[in-house]
């Protein structure tokens, strides 16, 4: 592929990623991506075998962008490690998950709808490791012994709850993270009551 062709292909992928962010999988069509990229709709056949390839590339670009944002915030947390307490780590975690190129509601609508599209869900699953790694790095700054998957689930759940109830996502997630961190990380086995005698 020529340099010009590569540039056009990347423009189409960026356009498709933007459409995916704002309108979900149904918004991503060859024609819509070409229109947003100021290219002829017929040109898309030169750069993609089919619609699914374009959709997969758009999803990969989005998950890379989210992981990059989280990674940048993880870098910041590590650079300020000596000054970082639990309160700071909570803020870093929230920023890593709430900072998105698209409006937060659109982002979560996209994630929810992705489950109905195997192409997108596969792309997100494949790229999830980088996001998990960034969250793990932030947790490590304050030696918080929680799996990244658990923390991400708490944050995602808090954001969806807040959006559905018209509450502030940041404040809602902050409360949930504080509750999580306040829980004991290891529970002692429940003691058994001594047997009763007649």
Summary of predicted features, one role per range:
Residues 70-103, 148-151:
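Hydrophobic alpha-helical connector segments
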Residues 60-67:
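Short, basic, alpha-helical segments at the C-terminal edge of helix-turn-helix-like DNA-binding modules
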Residues 11, 19-57:
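Helix-turn-helix
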Residues 51, 61, 131:
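DNA major-groove recognition helices of helix-turn-helix
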Residues 11, 15-22, 68-72, 76, ...:
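Solvent-exposed, amphipathic alpha-helical segments
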Residues 67-70, 98-109, 113-143, 149:
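Amphipathic alpha-helical packing segments from all-alpha helical-bundle domains
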């Amino acid at each position: 592929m020529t340099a010009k062709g590569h540039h056009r292909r990347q423009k189409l992928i960026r356009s498709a990623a933007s459409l995916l962010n704002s309108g979900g999988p149904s918004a991503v069509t060859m024609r819509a991506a070409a229109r947003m990229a100021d290219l002829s709709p017929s040109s898309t056949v030169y750069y993609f075998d089919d619609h699914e390839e374009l959709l997969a590339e758009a999803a990969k670009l989005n998950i890379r962008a989210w992981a990059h944002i989280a990674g940048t915030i993880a870098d910041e947390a590590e650079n300020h490690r000596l000054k970082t307490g639990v309160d700071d780590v909570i803020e870093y975690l929230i920023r890593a998950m709430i900072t998105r190129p698209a409006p937060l509601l659109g982002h979560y609508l996209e994630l929810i709808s992705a489950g109905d599209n195997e192409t997108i869900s596969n792309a997100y699953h494949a790229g999830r490791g980088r996001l998990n790694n960034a969250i793990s790095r932030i947790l490590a700054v304050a030696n918080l012994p929680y799996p990244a998957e658990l923390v991400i689930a708490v944050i995602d759940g808090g954001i969806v709850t807040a959006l559905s109830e018209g509450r502030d996502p940041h404040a809602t997630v902050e409360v949930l993270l504080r509750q999580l961190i306040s829980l004991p990380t290891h529970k002692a086995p429940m003691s058994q009551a001594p047997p009763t005698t007649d």
